[in-house]
């Protein structure tokens, strides 16, 4: 199995292809990407027969920006007979996966696939039973075994394969299913909520998103991101010349500072989180974020980088490299992750966590 399917946001196939080609090449896993515009997925075909498995084992999924999910697959199954689609799929997976922990029957996230998605949900139950009978799936779901993927690209046409549960997205189609809170000031609140799900392990939420923490929201108006911090019982400095939603001010947890987010400088040293969703050139935002991290003004940050029309992967890579270089220059060890989230549009979301600093300054987490 030498092909890897990568699910992505429709319209960003070229960026996804450029990224996987670059990062696979860095690990000497060479191949080429098959791209169809607005398809919502990319296929990276490796030159060596076992390199698909090697790629999804060795390249950290968390290092990918534009992929929502990935899995290794074999050849395309076509013209599945409507009276028995199950037998050919089981046949393709026997000998490839043994005692898998979960089945996901998926499609790309496109308007054209919505009808197909309804079929996939109905088809999952009988297919799961057949795969269990054949030993492809274990008799119970477990996160400790590979995930079996059946990916339909059209009626009667699918790829079959697997991913490793320790190196994939835990979400169906790579999309966290979040509900918009009725009392949130704007839909942008879902970006930050999704970022928490993607970047912070669930078993660390109580420690890293704790009650009573202090946070700063730069460019906060009307308060979509502040809402997520308030919901977690944090105290928030919301920085923006524009007004905040009265519902947030009424909580007593928000201090509204009428300032430019690029000029604001914190006066206290107990800030755990800084979040930022300002519409500005990505290089300018990256420079501001690096300044906050280098000066130890916050412990963790989540921010958005708005993407240009062209060379998006190159632009994001350049901005992340700049932040990394600034941290290295000042002896700061940090963890950097970036992802184009489901709720992002022409942007990517970045998470940086300071681990420790080799020079004097604020007390870091470890």
From Swiss-Prot:
It is found in: Cytoplasm. GO terms for molecular function: S-adenosylmethionine-dependent methyltransferase activity. One of its GO terms (cellular component) is cytoplasm. It catalyses: cytidine(2498) in 23S rRNA + S-adenosyl-L-methionine = 2'-O-methylcytidine(2498) in 23S rRNA + S-adenosyl-L-homocysteine + H(+). Pfam families: FtsJ (PF01728), RlmM_FDX (PF18125), RLMM_N (PF21239). Keywords: Cytoplasm, Methyltransferase, rRNA processing, S-adenosyl-L-methionine, Transferase. InterPro entries: RlmM_FDX, RlmM_THUMP-like, RNA_MeTrfase_FtsJ_dom, rRNA_MeTrfase_M, SAM-dependent_MTases_sf. S-adenosyl-L-methionine binds at residues 188, 221-224, 240, 260, 277. GO terms for biological process: methylation; rRNA processing. Monomer. Catalyzes the 2'-O-methylation at nucleotide C2498 in 23S rRNA. Its EC number is 2.1.1.186. Belongs to the class I-like SAM-binding methyltransferase superfamily. RNA methyltransferase RlmE family. RlmM subfamily. The active site is at residue 306. The keyword Methyltransferase applies. This is Ribosomal RNA large subunit methyltransferase M. Coiled coil: none annotated.
